[in-house]
């Protein structure tokens, strides 16, 4: 997920991860991300997984969300060059959502009002995106310079399927953008979900406790599900061994600060220097929390088991999160999801900073 710069005076101290971490043996992960950049939440989440010990990132698949996929591919390739991770392939993915399009979203905006964030459909001048509006296939000049490496000559859905079949029941799928690529993989291969080790998603919103008007006024709205509701619906109905959901509710309990960036920059590693040079985004740690919680589940102190889906009706709630308990769920194939509710904030910040200091 995104996003936008907000400052905070919150300070934390970075200390090394405990030797008794859950990262005791190599774990395999596929990263599916809307990798807008440079730096920012999307890139920091990828760095958390890339820099984690005992973790192998099999590849990074790109999907439009915060920005258009062609631009995201270039930002992510360049990030991997600057942080010395060029052994990890970047795979082009879906440019457009399955059904929702820009014209329909503009029409809904005129009828139901404006959302604070439109990602690839938004505009920096209006505060609804991180970059000026541009056409999907246009890649503006990159602040961090253009990459010299190339993306893999394969599409995201087939790459995801191939990797899961190569490592049956060993690969976690980490999805922190709209779920278009994951939905396409599920439609191409009925075994894709069941052959994985599980799914980690940054998405959805249940009942965030906040005065932030973006979520206080629309408590079930969240950008990743909203951008491609049909994809989220497909993914949430698939037979995953386990689904962990990092929602708005828990994400807004975190905050990236200038003090954190100062601590990260003091490491003078390639990752730290990349973030020090290009990070100007001080906001909630959405995607980073989903990544670190997968690396160390102990930072999640409370979760709720809920059945989760997405509203597909064409009205003001199109793309909103739907939830049920076991006694109230519909008979439509919804799956049980581990919905994260609360965290050990200090432990999360320590591990996050250590991972950003990287190598």
Where are these regions (language model features)?
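A short, structured active-site edge motif that brings together acidic residues
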Residues: 89-97
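Bacterial N-terminal signal peptides that target proteins for export
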Residues: 1-12
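Active-site histidine-anchored catalytic micro-motif
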Residues: 25-86, 101, 128-245, 251
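Conformational coupling and interaction surfaces
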Residues: 25-27, 44-57, 223-359
């Amino acid at each position: 997920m995104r996003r936008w710069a907000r400052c905070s005076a919150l300070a934390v101290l970075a200390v090394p991860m405990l030797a008794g971490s859950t990262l005791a043996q190599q774990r395999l992960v596929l990263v599916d991300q809307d990798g807008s950049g440079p730096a920012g939440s999307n890139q920091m989440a990828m760095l958390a997984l890339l820099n984690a010990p005992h973790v192998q990132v099999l590849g990074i698949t790109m999907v439009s969300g915060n920005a258009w996929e062609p631009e995201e591919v270039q930002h992510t390739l360049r990030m991997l060059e600057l942080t010395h991770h060029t052994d990890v392939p970047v795979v082009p993915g879906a440019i457009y959502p399955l059904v929702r399009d820009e014209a329909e979203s503009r029409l809904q905006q005129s009828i139901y009002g404006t959302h604070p964030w439109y990602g690839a459909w938004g505009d920096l001048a209006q505060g609804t995106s991180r970059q000026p509006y541009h056409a999907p296939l246009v890649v503006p000049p990159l602040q961090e310079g253009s990459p010299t490496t190339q993306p893999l000559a394969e599409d995201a859905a087939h790459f995801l399927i191939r990797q899961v079949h190569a490592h049956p029941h060993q690969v976690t799928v980490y999805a922190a953008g709209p779920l278009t690529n994951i939905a396409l993989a599920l439609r191409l291969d009925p075994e894709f979900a069941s052959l994985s080790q599980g799914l980690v998603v940054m998405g959805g919103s249940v009942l965030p406790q906040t005065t932030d008007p973006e979520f206080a006024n629309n408590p079930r709205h969240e950008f990743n599900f909203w951008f491609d509701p049909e994809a989220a619906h497909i993914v949430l109905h698939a037979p995953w061994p386990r689904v962990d959901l990092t929602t708005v509710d828990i994400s807004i309990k975190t905050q990236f600060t200038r003090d954190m960036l100062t601590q990260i920059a003091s490491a003078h590693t390639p990752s730290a220097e990349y973030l020090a040079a290009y990070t100007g985004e001080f906001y909630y740690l959405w995607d980073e929390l989903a990544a670190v919680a997968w690396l160390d589940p102990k930072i999640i102190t409370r979760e709720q088991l809920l059945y989760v889906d997405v509203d597909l009706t064409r009205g003001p709630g199109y793309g909103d999160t739907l939830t049920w308990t076991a006694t109230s769920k519909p008979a439509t194939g919804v799956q049980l999801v581990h919905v994260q509710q609360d965290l050990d904030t200090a432990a999360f910040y320590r591990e996050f900073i250590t991972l950003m200091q990287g190598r």
